[in-house]
Amino acid sequence: MILERNRRCQLALLMIAILAAIAGQTDAQKAAKLTAVSTCASKEKCHTCIQTEGCAWCMQPDFKGQSRCYQNTSSLCPEEFAYSPITVEQILVNNKLTNQYKAELAAGGGGSAMSGSSSSSYSSSSSSSSFYSQSSSGSSSASGYEEYSAGEIVQIQPQSMRLALRVNEKHNIKISYSQAEGYPVDLYYLMDLSKSMEDDKAKLSTLGDKLSETMKRITNNFHLGFGSFVDKVLMPYVSTIPKKLEHPCENCKAPYGYQNHMPLNNNTESFSNEVKNATVSGNLDAPEGGFDAIMQAIACRSQIGWREQARRLLVFSTDAGFHYAGDGKLGGVIAPNDGECHLSPKGEYTHSTLQDYPSISQINQKVKDNAINIIFAVTASQLSVYEKLVEHIQGSSAAKLDNDSSNVVELVKEEYRKISSSVEMKDNATGDVKITYFSSCLSNGPEVQTSKCDNLKEGQQVSFTAQIQLLKCPEDPRDWTQTIHISPVGINEVMQIQLTMLCSCPCENPGSIGYQVQANSCSGHGTSMCGICNCDDSYFGNKCECSATDLTSKFANDTSCRADSTSTTDCSGRGHCVCGACECHKRPNPIEIISGKHCECDNFSCERNRNQLCSGPDHGTCECGRCKCKPGWTGSNCGCQESNDTCMPPGGGEICSGHGTCECGVCKCTVNDQGRFSGRHCEKCPTCSGRCQELKDCVQCQMYKTGELKNGDDCARNCTQFVPVGVEKVEIDETKDEQMCKFFDEDDCKFMFKYSEQGELHVYAQENKECPAKVFMLGIVMGVIAAIVLVGLAILLLWKLLTTIHDRREFARFEKERMNAKWDTGENPIYKQATSTFKNPMYAGK
């Protein structure tokens, strides 16, 4: 059979009527209605019609209108022939939350363990759907719920539902979550037992009892287990020299991949003994085979002892990096990791040398499938590596471990507090289904777009709104029915949604009242499907009235080829009339197509952006002269992002931090009395005073018992908006729009705190104030006096030293000059000798 080729788009007469009806409306309203009408009118098949938002299909046999696909707000079609499926929700299992049920029992209400469930079926005016026609066995099908079992823990409500959804329609589902008090905890400690971790093992064996006691104070339903790992017993990971294989280091056992020493159980006293008896080993390269151990610890659920209803914690302790997929090729292992359990009865990993290390994505998938929270307890040198790793593993965290693991108890306690005090909703929806979460968490304000709530306590209940939207129908009809799971991260409980996508019309299938073989309305030469003819071979035309072998009237003009009675041009001048139907011209470019009942549509004359039709193929497609945007894009040229995700602060909160509007995926910041906001998410305001002064007194009284409100009654009465969380050091995370506050109190001590307002107020204060050292006045006075005396003595001694040196130099010079002096022999000119001798010169000696 030849599918009819000439049911095209156009609605000229109808458009004139619509224009007259909405003459008093604004231009924007008129344009919106005309766009909707044109979009519907261009659809020629029932299934493409109902896959278009706001459209309905008329399967009236003698339909006189221009198009069977019309806007479903119109009354163009008799009700009994109109088909427009509606979105329907039916709750199947709706057990009450455990905390709520216990509260009702304690109050003596004796009410049902179930809240009411809704049940309905989608239908059209022409036919009813069989979506809910099947009956289920058991009480749940009869009443829409099941009785609550006293031994069952329920933390998410509802638990199961059915949903029939049309394309592009959004449906909101209310989800409630409450952490049950005393919820069971399974903690499996996975430790690196290479030689460098020997002191850590010794410390853990002494802290095992303390770890058990600490966790039992949190929940009395606590199981503890222990496993260890080294690396693959192959070069270059370990030395394969026979002697080294037996004793790779002093007091070491032979290397191994992974071993489960102690499955999870409530005999926590044996944990310390197992750790103490475990022997360290040695390897060659720096990274360890921890990923092999993680995969086996998660995949081997029964051998490890993971319970169905428990919060599952896997503490991974190491001081080194990790091998991942591909590293096994260095040792000649090319078979990829299959993600299955391969433990011997003794708990040893049997495929360590047969399979490669798992990839990060494999670890992440196993974590999601088994609701595991991994805590990477690593030394400071490796912390930055594992902080990047946790970004790719759902529900995981990284924390600093002391070099000897002495802080392991506090580390586990703090990480468990962080995990248990928050809830984040995740789902397994495919790319055809979009789920957006909204919640007000614990605040009384309006809901904001977020899938995570923090600072929860046991018993507190939060609600989420899951907005489900079917973006498009999958190409394979087998995918039109899917099961979607929504679950809190790290909790093995799911809300199951049995989704049926309304992508087809019953009248297109045999057995429907709208499906007639050799119908009279098709001249007896075709099958009527939803009111349109699917002609037999050799016949064509709107009613299969034309024969391919009879050419007498094949090219005769017909008024049905003209847009309206006033038009004198067939097929809008872009085609020719064949047997009362337009055959549109072909364009030189085969990608460019002219279409429509009167060739009035095309896919190349739409608005352009950046020289591309509808901003490019990734943003939208051109249909009948208008851009049809793909999911996530909007605007006349599909150039704007529909989602506000790019306007949401990374840490969550309000759109544009509550200080602007999101336009085309970009925040437009506002100016208020405080000042001008800026930044990518309008999170910065250099001129704003903030709330530091407002929060100061409450932080002082609650954290330090000082300040104007230090009186207990005053503090309790005035400080009800928040309770500050103590931290060792206050550091700002600019991505979360946090503000730093610093003050000095009456003791001249500096105290610091930070706050953020992402949906609700969070305050983090430094646990210890920074106070100046106390001044010892007597010591200062005595010190000054002593300093003066000592300085005086020093000056005197210095003066004495200098004078002595000077005198000695002078004396030495004097002595030197005296010793070197040469005196001439002379007589005193006034001295007279006692005797005088006179000699007569004339005397001759006689």
From Swiss-Prot:
Function: Integrin alpha-PS1/beta-PS is a receptor for laminin. Integrin alpha-PS2/beta-PS is a receptor for Tig, wb and Ten-m. Contributes to endodermal integrity and adhesion between the midgut epithelium and the surrounding visceral muscle. Essential for migration of the primordial midgut cells and for maintaining, but not establishing, cell polarity in the midgut epithelium. The two beta subunits mediate midgut migration by distinct mechanisms: beta-PS requires rhea/talin and Itgbn does not. Required for rhea/talin correct cellular localization in the midgut.
Keywords, in A-Z order: Behavior, Cell adhesion, Cell membrane, Developmental protein, Disulfide bond, Flight, Glycoprotein, Integrin, Membrane, Olfaction, Phosphoprotein, Receptor, Repeat, Sensory transduction, Signal, Transmembrane, Transmembrane helix, Vision
GO CC terms in record: apical plasma membrane; basal plasma membrane; cell leading edge; cell surface; costamere; dendrite; focal adhesion; integrin complex
Encoding gene (name): mys
Record-annotated membrane-spanning stretches: 778-798
Main location: membrane
KO phenotype (gene knockout): In zygotic mutant embryos, midgut forms primary constrictions but fails to elongate and the visceral muscle does not flatten but remains attached to the midgut epithelium. Embryos lacking maternal and zygotic mys show a delay in midgut migration. Mutant larvae present an olfactory phenotype, showing reduced response to isoamyl acetate but normal response to ethyl acetate.
Organism of origin: Drosophila melanogaster
Cystine connections: C46-C55, C249-C252, C300-C341, C441-C453, C473-C741, C507-C530, C522-C533, C535-C544, C546-C579, C561-C577, C571-C582, C584-C599, C601-C624, C606-C622, C614-C627, C629-C638, C640-C664, C647-C662, C656-C667, C669-C682, C685-C688, C692-C701, C698-C771, C719-C749
Effect caused by changing F811A: Rescues muscle attachment defect and loss of cell layer attachment in mutants
Cytoplasmic side: 799-846
Protein family per UniProt: Belongs to the integrin beta chain family.
Quaternary data: Heterodimer of an alpha and a beta subunit. Beta-PS associates with either alpha-PS1, alpha-PS2, alpha-PS3, alpha-PS4 or alpha-PS5.
UniProt KW Signal keyword: yes
Domain of life: Eukaryota
Residues in VWFA domain copies: 186-419
Protein name: Integrin beta-PS
Tissue: In ovaries, strongly expressed in follicle cells. In oocytes, expressed in the forming dorsal appendages (at protein level). Expressed in the embryonic dorsal cuticle, the larval eye and the wing imaginal disk. In testes, detected at the interface between somatic hub cells and cyst stem cells.
